[in-house]
Amino acid sequence: MTRRIVISGAPGTGKTSIIKELSIRGYKCHSEISREIIENQLETGGTTTPWQDLDKFSELVIDKRLIQFESAVDDVEFYDRGIIDSLAYLLKDKIPITNKWKSIANNNKYFNTVFITPP
């Protein structure tokens, strides 16, 4: 069984640096999906960004995080944020969490230890 370990925390607190170091040390690591989507949208002139269409952006992030989750094959894999991070941002912005998203979070559990970078 794969141990999927999430590294979470506020923006700019070192999550990506930790992920890069773990990758250098040979661990399978998954990048921050939100950043990739935003960069792609800015490059292509798209509007699926958190400041233009948070609902659509969140759906895309959750879908891509689910793909990351389901692709795990190694004994231990690290994630720069997880599915639950997306739901937390929705709650913060008072956006209702759909039953689909709740189901995805409930049916795709990460390892019970989560690392949170300090602010």
Annotate each language-model stretch with its function.
Residues 7:
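Hydrophobic anchor at the beta1->P-loop junction of P-loop NTPases
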Residues 57-74, 99-110:
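Short amphipathic alpha-helices and their capping/turn segments at secondary-structure boundaries
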Residues 4, 75-78:
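Residue-level preference for the first positions of well-ordered beta-strands
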Residues 20-64:
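Conserved substrate/cofactor phosphate-moiety recognition/catalytic segment
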Residues 11:
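The conserved Walker
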Residues 17:
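Conserved Walker
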Residues 14:
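Conserved glycine(s) of the Walker
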Residues 79-119:
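ATP-dependent NMP and nucleoside kinases share a basic, alpha-helical "lid"
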